[in-house]
Design a protein with these regions (language model features):
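Secondary-structure boundary motif
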Residues: 9, 34-35
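C-terminal catalytic/substrate-binding lobe primarily of soluble NAD(P)-dependent oxidoreductases
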Residues: 35-192
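General beta-strand structural signal in soluble alpha/beta enzymes
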Residues: 14-16, 44
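Short alpha-helices
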Residues: 18-28, 33
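Rossmann-fold NAD(P)-binding glycine/threonine-rich loop
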Residues: 1-14
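Short, conserved acidic/polar surface loops in the N-terminal third of protein domains
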Residues: 2-4, 26-28, 54-56
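Short gly/pro/ser/thr-enriched loop/turn and capping motifs at secondary-structure boundaries
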Residues: 1, 21-24, 47-52
Length: 192
């Protein structure tokens, strides 16, 4: 919202939310949704994971530490029951497997960009969750909640930069599930 206010009278173009999430994930969701007569539910799941995790968090730095901590510490926009809500980060835990590999997914902030505003009044549910290897979420809850590092994010960032290796050998998972009405039938389409 602050960016929209700054851009309102600007003389230059600024195109935010053009990454993986937000960005690509929203394009995929829109592409799937346009094939329906009416959309009911949109679920988006994205994970950028190390191909070869070697620590208890089962995570290596694959992008910005600042962005990582930000998405774990701030409220998450979503739509449930047709109403815009603020969901807690690290909540809404799900488990699934793909090609024999186990994963977990949980609420994180920012991945929807402006989709809650775009689809307000048009969908029953819309949410975004980050995908990680099992156990990651519980350890992050311990660090952020039990140890209080959510209130000391700069220290947590320093610890992660010092202790967690960066890798370019990553795996990106993208799942988008859209369900709704098409030709009088309730259907579901998935991008994976």
């Amino acid at each position: 919202k602050a960016i929209k206010d700054m851009a309102r009278d600007a003389k230059t173009a600024f195109m935010p939310q053009c990454g993986l999430a937000p960005g690509f994930i929203g394009i995929v969701a829109h592409h799937l949704a346009k094939g329906f007569d009416s959309v009911q539910d949109v679920q988006m799941r994205v994970g950028a994971l190390p191909a070869f995790p070697t620590n208890s968090l089962k995570y290596n730095l694959t992008w910005s530490v600042d962005g990582l901590i930000n998405e774990y510490c701030h409220p998450c926009e979503a739509i449930h029951g047709g109403e815009s809500i603020s969901a807690l980060p690290l909540e809404g835990l799900e488990h699934f497997s793909l090609d024999g590999v186990e994963y977990e997914a949980f609420n994180t902030s920012g991945g929807l960009g402006t989709l809650c505003e775009t689809w307000a009044g048009q969908v029953r549910s819309l949410d975004y969750k980050t995908v990680r290897y099992p156990g990651h979420r519980d350890l992050m809850q311990f660090l952020l909640g039990d140890l209080g590092l959510a209130a000391d994010q700069e220290n947590l960032k320093a610890i992660m930069r010092k202790s967690m290796p960066t890798t370019m050998q990553d795996v990106v998972l993208v799942f988008v599930t859209v369900s709704g009405q098409k030709n009088g039938m309730l259907l579901q389409e998935v991008f994976a």
